[in-house]
Design a protein with these regions (language model features):
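Vicinal oxygen chelate
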Residues: 2-9, 23, 32-37, 57, ...
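Intrinsic, low-complexity N-terminal interaction/targeting segments
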Residues: 85-89, 96, 124, 286-290, ...
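A broadly used, surface-exposed interaction patch
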Residues: 88-90, 97, 105-111
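Short, flexible turn/loop "capping" segments at secondary-structure junctions
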Residues: 18-22, 103-107, 233-237, 301-305
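Generic structural signal for well-ordered beta-strand positions
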Residues: 51, 160-161, 266, 360-361
Length: 410
């Protein structure tokens, strides 16, 4: 890790304030009490595909430790080719196995995971965090998923993961066979490592059947014409994020995400006397939003979670309108108590609740920040009328801009 000048790090030939650069939100997860309903909600209603599961119960010291606590499996889910972009674990089992989880039951988010640009960046981050006294939960390589990573805590004990190189699920829909989990690492790896391609080549030489991994079968028939493709629901998730958090101290949380993880402040809002902060990792208006805990009750949201909302971007405005009807028809609870002032950079959005009461923010458009680093002036933003959903919209200058979805929708 070479440095040049005052506290600058050479990241691929560019001098940065951190020895890594976050490119995007890679995945995110909840700890749920209502596991059966949660799996159905996220897979059948929202369209996440289960790419793998693992048995959390294997960590128990005795069968009695987790007896009667429900589904032992953790579910790894995807909307595209990344092995997982969303993860569900059983909250009661995690608390039974982990004293820290028992001590902080309001931390129902199990991970906030950010993609960096290379394995070297992960390795340099691990070293730098250690030098700065940033508490590291663990480092290594996960299986399932194959992502090289390190986990650190923010000022509210949310677990943030930095990773590189997550497994890709290809055209046949099969995840990596479990026999290939021998490349799991439980500590920071020595660099360089062999490539993913060479791992597959070795598996073929060893006679591994590459199609023996998990393959998801959708529980609903593909009856909706979604812009020319038949899908089981009338919309398609094409991106995850932003992550919106309730925090004890907005200033302290902002300092961690800015100074330690390298996020950039895009905008701040004062709402009913409370400061709210919107930060970005790339060109999107915000990939992270920070709100004071005092707003939970004012917004009618769960008082026992630090998750304000988890964002899901749909492919277009028409699909967002279709999603509102589809989810309402299938019994999803919707709230209109989250005012537009608290999600600048997004125009039309709907907020729905999962079976545990976590708020999900569905939207289709995210304002993009250009070369000068300035967001769109407030007076030039679209101003939706509450409760009105026009049949069609005039475009903004950055409509359909930002991170694209790669590959087929289904």
């Amino acid at each position: 890790m070479e440095t040049s000048g005052q506290m600058k790090f050479n990241v691929g030939g560019v001098l940065l304030d951190q020895p890594f650069k976050i490119r995007r939100l890679g995945h995110f997860g909840f700890n749920l009490v209502n596991m059966e309903e949660g799996v159905r909600f996220y897979s059948e209603l929202l369209g996440f595909k289960v790419s793998d599961n693992n048995d959390m119960g294997r960590r128990a010291t005795s069968p009695e430790q987790i007896a009667g606590l429900g589904d032992r499996k953790g579910y790894f889910m995807r909307y595209g080719t990344d092995h997982h972009s969303f993860v569900i674990f059983n909250k009661r089992i995690r608390e039974a196995l982990n004293p820290e989880a028992r001590a902080r039951p309001e931390l129902t988010i199990n991970q906030i995971t950010w993609q960096v640009g290379s394995l070297r960046e992960v390795g340099n981050a691990i070293k730098w965090f250690g030098e700065r006294g940033v508490k590291i939960q663990r480092s290594g390589r996960d299986m399932p998923g194959s992502n090289w990573h390190t986990y650190v805590y923010d000022s509210d004990r949310h677990i943030n993961e930095l990773y590189y190189g997550i497994e890709q699920v290809g055209w046949n829909g099969h995840s990596k066979p479990k026999v290939m989990y021998n490349r799991r690492f439980d500590e920071a790896p020595e660099l360089p490592q062999i490539s993913e391609f060479d791992e597959v080549q070795q598996a073929l030489k060893d006679g591994v059947e590459l199609t023996s991994g998990h393959r998801h079968i959708d529980g609903l028939p593909a009856t909706y014409d979604v812009d020319g493709i038949l899908l089981p629901r009338p919309f398609k998730i094409v991106r995850i994020g932003p992550v919106s958090l309730f925090v004890k101290d907005v200033d302290a949380a902002e300092a961690f995400y800015r100074d330690t993880l390298g996020f950039i402040l895009t905008e701040e809002v004062s709402w009913q006397g409370h400061r709210c902060v919107f930060m970005r990792a790339n060109t999107e208006h915000h990939s992270l939003a920070l709100y004071p805990l005092a707003l939970r009750e004012k917004l009618g949201l769960r008082l026992d979670t630090t998750c304000m909302a988890f964002g899901l971007q749909l492919a277009n405005y028409q699909q967002l309108r279709n999603a509102v009807r589809f989810l309402s028809d299938h019994g999803a609870r919707v709230t209109d108590r989250v005012p537009a002032e608290l999600y600048p950079g997004i125009d039309y959005a709907v907020h729905v609740f999962d079976p545990d009461g976590h708020c999900l923010q569905l939207y289709y458009y995210m304002e993009q920040v250009g070369w000068d680093g300035k967001p769109r002036p407030k007076e030039l933003r679209r101003k939706p009328v509450h409760g009105e959903w026009p049949a069609a919209l005039e475009p903004m200058s950055d409509t359909y801009h930002g991170e694209p979805f790669l590959g087929p929708w289904g």
